[in-house]
Amino acid sequence: SGDIKAILERNGSERTRLIDILWDVQHLYGHIPDEVL
């Protein structure tokens, strides 16, 4: 989805940003959907 791409672009592709990416996804959807994992 475009929202996920925007989150990834904003956080970059560094593995150290994984928690920040997951927090953004959870904030967007209210949970972390299986298809995102």
Curated annotation (Swiss-Prot):
<keyword id="KW-0614">Plasmid</keyword>
<keyword id="KW-0408">Iron</keyword>
<dbReference type="GO" id="GO:0051539">
    <property type="term" value="F:4 iron, 4 sulfur cluster binding"/>
</dbReference>
<comment type="function">
    <text>Subunits alpha and gamma of HoxS constitute an NADH--oxidoreductase.</text>
</comment>
<comment type="similarity">
    <text>Belongs to the complex I 51 kDa subunit family.</text>
</comment>
<keyword id="KW-0479">Metal-binding</keyword>
<keyword id="KW-0285">Flavoprotein</keyword>
<keyword id="KW-0963">Cytoplasm</keyword>
<comment type="subunit">
    <text>Tetramer of an alpha and a gamma subunits (flavin-containing dimer), and a delta and a nickel-containing beta subunits (hydrogenase dimer).</text>
</comment>
<keyword id="KW-0004">4Fe-4S</keyword>
<keyword id="KW-0560">Oxidoreductase</keyword>
<dbReference type="GO" id="GO:0046872">
    <property type="term" value="F:metal ion binding"/>
</dbReference>
<dbReference type="GO" id="GO:0005737">
    <property type="term" value="C:cytoplasm"/>
</dbReference>
<keyword id="KW-0520">NAD</keyword>
<keyword id="KW-0411">Iron-sulfur</keyword>
<keyword id="KW-0288">FMN</keyword>
<protein>
    <recommendedName>
        <fullName>NAD-reducing hydrogenase HoxS subunit alpha</fullName>
        <ecNumber>1.12.1.2</ecNumber>
    </recommendedName>
</protein>
<dbReference type="GO" id="GO:0047985">
    <property type="term" value="F:hydrogen dehydrogenase activity"/>
</dbReference>
<dbReference type="InterPro" id="IPR041921">
    <property type="entry name" value="NuoE_N"/>
</dbReference>
